[in-house]
Structures are given as C-alpha cells and as structure tokens.
Amino acid sequence: MDLARVLAQYDAEVRASPKAPPGLVVERADGVVCLTGYFNFISWWELTPSTVRQAVASHAAHFRSRGEKLMWRVYEHDSPAEISGCLAEEGFEPDAAGTLMIFDLANEVLATTGNVDIRRVKTEEHLEDFVKASEQAFGERDTWQRTAYSDRLNDPDLALYVAYVSAEIAASARLEIGSARSFGLLFGGGVAPSYRRLGIYRALVAERAREARRRDLLYLSTDARETSKPILQNLGFVSAAKEVTWVLNPS
C-alpha cells in the first residue's frame, strides 16, 4: 500500500468531502468544512498562517454563541503549523491523542475465534441493545445514537453491530461508507468491562472488514486510541498519522 497516496485520498474523500447523514449538515465557510447537527465537528480546512487565527476565532465565537460543543481534529500532517496553538489560545482543550489507522482490503482478513455472537442491527429492539452496549462500554449515556440511527437501519451506507456472549450484551460497533465509496469508516467497538480480553473487539473489526469487502470497498480506516492500536496492528492495520481532537466546550 502506498501510504502517502492513500492518506491523500483519505483527506480528499473523507475529510474534505464528508457525507452528511440525516441529522447533520455540511457547512463550508472561511475555508473550513464543518459537520453540524447532533454534534459539531470540523473535518477539513484550507487555511494559511495569515488566515488561521481569524478562522479559529470566528468558529469558536459562533459555537459559543449557540452554547454548543465543537470538535476540531488535527492530524500531524495538517497545515498550517500554527493551528494547534491557535486552537489552544481560543480555549479548545486537547482530548486523548489517537492514530489514524488504515487497512488495505486487498489483504486477507484474519479469522477470529471465541464464543461471540455478532448480529447486524435491523430493528428498534436491536438498536436499544446497540445503545446499551455503548453506554456499558464507555460509561456515558448515548441517547444521541438512538436519534441518529433510528431512521437509518436500512441505510445501505451504514451497518451497526451488537456482540453478545451467552445472550448477554457485550459490545457494539459501526461501519459507515465514505462519500466516494473507497473507505469504510470504523467507529465504536467499545466492549463492556466484564467482557474485555475475550477477542470481541477483534471479532467486530473482522466482521466489518468482511462486510466492507462484500461492498467492494478498498480500505478501512479508524481513529484508534492507544489501547486499540496493538490489536489493529495485529489485524494488519497500518498507522497513517497521529491525531489530536481539540474540544471547545460551551461556557
């Protein structure tokens, strides 16, 4: 895999031209691409050292006036170099660092083992299990997911999964199809504490890889935390870029 080429393709297709699912809108202003709705997330920008400070200040003021949280994700290859400093000056705080990881679907998807039952979410009942699994894994209420996905259970560009162990909810995960249909985007994968170290995270990644292959996608991508990175590397993912998500909380 030509990692530099694939990373440039990811930037162009996923970050600069994001697909807005129901409930989100893509807004472009001042050289910045922002998804707004049930969350607010800046995915891309074309700024210079002379324009970055004003653009950051403008977006910070806008979302503060609305009393809404704003996330701005910066990768190590992004420019201008001043952007992280400008975000800090405007009151953004860095979340835990992560790594963009990419898997070439031309490679073999590793088999998984373990007594885990992975089911695709097709009904409202299973969506409730999906939300519960996320809440158990991350210890936070995730009611936004119910709103975001209840009308998308038959969306061909979305696949939600719940993992069960002995009929008990253990984990959940999500696959989204990028706008140019080259990338499958992996989200979630959180496992409830009592079911960790059983290979469930790995099984959910493998299941989504198989689904992505069935849809003739080229790559999988995910923003991984340090705890997930070794598992993904073992499955064949390659580290593409370090990242930090800067968060502006309403005050």
Model regions and ranges:
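Conserved beta-hairpin
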Residues: V25-R28, E76, E82-E93, A159-A173
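Conserved acetyl-CoA-binding loop-helix of GNAT-fold acetyltransferases
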Residues: V52-A60, G188-P193, R197-R210, P230, ...
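A short, well-structured alpha-helix characteristic of acyl/acetyltransferase catalytic modules
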Residues: T123-Q136
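N-terminal charged segments
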Residues: M1-R66, S79, D142-W144
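A short helix-loop-beta-strand connector motif used in the catalytic cores of GNAT acetyltransferases and
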Residues: K19-L24, G67-E68, S79, D95-G98, ...
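Acyl-donor-binding surface of acyltransferase catalytic domains
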Residues: S50-H126, T222, S228, V244-N249
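A conserved beta-turn-beta hairpin within the catalytic core of GNAT-like acetyltransferases
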Residues: C34-S43, D95, I177-F187, R196
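A conserved beta-strand-loop-helix scaffold within acyl/acetyltransferase catalytic domains
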Residues: R141-P193
